[in-house]
Amino acid sequence: MKIEPIIENIKEVILKHVPARYIFLFGSYAYGNPTEESDIDIYIVTPDDTGNFSELCAKIRGDLSKKKIFFVDLLLTRESVFEVRKMKNVLDRTVYQKGKIIYEY
């Protein structure tokens, strides 16, 4: 499966709803070892004043489903939290060190 056009669609949908600072692709697609059962893992870093993450995820997922893009895991975090956690938390550090930046503001 060609992942690049799907990633572009995901990025467009996210940016429609979220003023992202960074959007990372992580997991098997970023690391080059996806399987047929792999989902697309996306990590979004937002400004600190970004609204309700649950509502934003619901809007993003709704738009993705209209584009027939279903297998996406979304994680959102605020920029100040990411700056602290990227050196301490295992997931955040892995995303920062090994993830692929697909958008940067």
Locations of the language-model features?
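Glycine-rich beta-strand-to-loop/alpha-helix junction loops that act as flexible
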Residues: F26-S28
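Short beta-strand->loop micro-motif that forms the acidic, two-metal-ion catalytic signature
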Residues: D41-V45
